[in-house]
Curated annotation (Swiss-Prot):
Gene3D superfamilies noted in UniProt: Arginyl tRNA synthetase N-terminal domain, HUPs, Isoleucyl-tRNA Synthetase, Domain 1
Keyword Transferase: no
Family of this protein: Belongs to the class-I aminoacyl-tRNA synthetase family.
Listed name of the protein: Arginine--tRNA ligase
Motif 'HIGH' region: chain residues: 122-132
UniProtKB keywords: Aminoacyl-tRNA synthetase, ATP-binding, Cytoplasm, Ligase, Nucleotide-binding, Protein biosynthesis
Gene Ontology terms, MF aspect: arginine-tRNA ligase activity; ATP binding
InterPro entries: aa-tRNA-synth_I_CS (IPR001412), Arg-tRNA-ligase (IPR001278), Arg-tRNA-synth_N (IPR005148), Arg-tRNA-synth_N_sf (IPR036695), ArgRS_core (IPR035684), DALR_anticod-bd (IPR008909), Rossmann-like_a/b/a_fold (IPR014729), tRNAsynth_Ia_anticodon-bd (IPR009080)
Location(s), subcellular: Cytoplasm
Amino acid sequence: MTLTQLLHDKLAAALIAAGVPDAQPLLQPASRPEFGDFQANGVMAAAKQRKMNPRELAQQVIDKLDLAGIASKIEIAGPGFINITLAPDFLAKRLDTVLDDARLGVRSVTEPQRVMVEYSSPNLAKEMHVGHLRSTIIGDTLARVVEFLGNNMVRGNHVGDWGTQFGMLTAYLVETRQAGKADLELSDLETFYRNAKIRFDEDPVFADTARNYVVRLQGGDADVLKLWEQFVDVSLAHCEAVYRKLGVGLTRADVRGESAYNDDLPVIVDELAAKNLLSEDDGAKVVYLDEFRNHDGDPMGVIVQKKDGGFLYTTTDLGAVRYRHKELNLDRVIYVVDARQSQHFQQMFTICRKAGFAPEAMSLEHVGFGTMMGDDGKPFKTRSGGTVKLIELLDEAEERAYALVSEKNPDLPEEEKRKIAHAVGIGAVKYADLSKNRNSDYIFNWDLMLAFEGNTAPYLQYAYTRVASIFRKVDRFDASAPLLITEPAEKQLALMLAQFSDVLNEVARTCFPHLLTQYLYQVATQFMRFYEACPILKSEGATQASRLKLARITADTLKTGLGLLGIEVLESM
């Protein structure tokens, strides 16, 4: 049981015993040390509802609150807050066995779920660009955390590998192959796509050929499918190069693109019709939803099949949900997709429920996110206004980090410099994004993200190496030594370390990775205060052993937490 859950359950029992069973404890960490360690704010609302004096009700709750061996002080503050100060011995006991556990005391969930996180999901017609960064790293972090908590994780890369543009690309592939330039052209997907588009726009004969390839592709023509597969293979190889550099856990096995649902789309439309959910509007097949209204107050329509018989993204997404329920038996699906797609997902989820493609027990969640902006406050672009390739951004991150490392440590071996530059550069880009509330837009700033001060990856990586350096200076470390929490800085660090499990559970529940970055930054800053206030190397005996143990738990927490963000730590920098 997590620390917060333990206190919550104790408070809930006390509220029941005090005659207010429907009241919520509303427990949260105290905002300042003078308010204790935790604060319960639920009494005031319960008192107001019953027209009682909130301080009197708070006292009744405290009289029933059993925190023996847990709290050293419980007091009423202000109009009826209950402030709880934890006993140092209690914290010591909770942390004492953490080093014996590779999971740092984080328990697996009692009822594991089958969870899919759908993320990254680029269109395979082009190379990945900076617009793919947020989905890729937010999704990867959520997948890592949810899996770490003991759930069965299914990663989903719903790539765009189908549609009319593939007729154009296949036609151009045939043309370049005949000219002996296919391999050269395919090595640069952006140029390949651009050249194909020019041919399509300027040459009517080529455009007709491309449309014919679409028909043949959708009809399952073996020769065209073979060409399409080659194109998909090359495109995925580009994606995998980005994933490797980013340290993202997606593999070829996680790819199930739009093409996988192609044969299901007519069935989806038939099943919607059988449920009397379809209407026809100017030849198109539409689902009208009373839950969504336009400006005139009329139900909004969602097209699932166009007048020409073609299907839309919504139809494919419906097929994917149906498959994920029937074949994968998922309990929860998390879609990490740009916030601008919010209405699409809410409408698609509503249709799924009405059609029975997903039962109510199957959680469907859209985890949206804002836009990465340039210094001008507009979406991040090249100086000339073009799209920034993601691989080029990551290369620049490494080069900038390499320059910093070379400046600070010019005598390091070249291989060591490159290793540090990779960890720091890639970590900086990822952390700068993950540390922001995902709902917000943010401004991309090289100087801020690569700084060794403040809430950045380099600061946390440096904090880890600083702890690691302590252990290179001691002759012996006894992990079984008892924790002795006597100084305020020791207690504050121990209190922070004891909340790791709470934070991970909250990240998994809310899908906000910045809660983890926030926590790790607090751990690092609290350790620095502890390091200044409580000498480790100059202390002796049981005191030194205890402080070393706190330092080791700190290092392991930083390493595990950063690992869940997909960020490397270094033993030295």
